[in-house]
Amino acid sequence: MRKMAILAAAVALLLVVVAPTGAASGPTIVELETVASGLTAPVGLTHAGDGSGRLFIVEQTGQIRVVEVGTLLAAPFLEISGLLPTLNAFFDERGLLGVAFHPAYEGNGRFYVRYSVPRSGDPGEPCFGTSRGCHSEVLAEYRVSAGDPNVADPSSGLVLFAVDEPQFNHDAGDVAFGPDGFLYFTLGDGGGANDGLADSPPSHGPIGNGQNIETTLGSILRIDVDHRAVCHRGRTLQVGTAATDAHLRHGDTPGACAGDTSTALYRIPSDNPFADTTGADEIYAYGLRNPYKFSFDDGPGGNGALYLADVGQNLFEEVNIIERGGNYGWVIREGFHCFDPFNPTTPPATCSDTGPSGEPLIDPIVEYSHPGSGFSPEIGITVIGGFVYRGSESPGLVGSYLFGDFAKAFFAPSGTLLFINDPTGPSPTIEQFQIGLDDRDYGLFLKGFGEDEDGEVYACGSIALAPTGTTGVCQRIVAEN
């Protein structure tokens, strides 16, 4: 039987506590060293793994910027703003959302980006008031230019995967290579609220997208981009969809295998949980709402675990360790708690502890709640996933999972930097970093994290809520004690 909500809350309180500033060991103090400023909505940072020491910063507005020898280069590495929808000046979750460099990038020059495209090809297509939905989410491959390592070849873009999204939000968008050499990327549940179940009729189907293994929405996906001539039982690119439109914009056309309508642009790993069975072949794990950020603990001493932060709705934010084939509960649960789409601010006392096919629902390792929710600890409204620290500048943080929260309130630049000092231990706890000896506020909307080739971790944020302005910064997190 499903745990009682009171029991779940008790378990959560045992597992998740914010260490008070006055704890006997004292706060963990960090300084933030700015490596790039003047950015527009920086949502992430990474490296190419080529020994160059360069940092690559993703701006939501469609640019990838390069930091080389401590200097932010004026010219972008990649500029694809012309492919994006017109982003809302108030707030938007669409845009350029993630980049991952191939493990053999130094030799093959290949990298992969996640971004949004308008379904009709018109950048101004509205998100609302249309039965066609809002936009499509795309995974594309690009290559570095032959003449300049700091500039990509814009004509090399090749769309590998695209899926229609009914709303502008819950686009997730992170992308990374795993220790197995396969490419992982995330998709949200399609947006709106309650996974569509409170709509009449349910706009995301009778069980919502998160619990529906026939759709890739609400999932983390895994594909093999190194064997693209092999047919798979994949998604079809229909004429007139954004996927086909994007191919044509990039100067390519959808391919096909003999006797199959697959695009043959990637292969499905044979041990994907639904490979050649019922369910979407690309799914690695599901039951997710808005898995905006994830990472692998693949640095020195790491165990390769996949950490994923799933953004909650009204009450709870969560961090998960992802298992192949795992069902992480949305829309049956939010965090450790039962979820009622018709009354989302009051967790039901009971609910199913299995998915539609009887598979067990997997709990997060930690959760926290929104300010004013009445559930402890109250931290913020949107979890931003980070990295397990495997660097050398802050030895006291080695093995800790560094992450944070977007803001304490939607309109206030009030992000929070957090960590879990023993994320794989029996009782992981959330702790808050103290910024500086003066204990100052972060003072930004936290929009993403990043990691360099040496395992140092960075936080990226902006004063602006929307993808506008140039108040964005990326800063290295360095422990002072």
What does each model-found stretch correspond to?
Residues 34-62, 380-388:
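Beta-strand-rich domains and repeat architectures in extracellular enzymes and scaffolds
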Residues 24-40, 153-157, 362-365:
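A short helix->beta-strand "capping" segment at the edge of beta-propeller domains
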Residues 58-61, 89, 94-96, 104, ...:
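Beta-propeller domain segments
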Residues 43-46, 100, 176, 295, ...:
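Conserved beta-strand position repeated across blades of beta-propeller domains
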Residues 73-101:
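Blade-loop segments of beta-propeller domains
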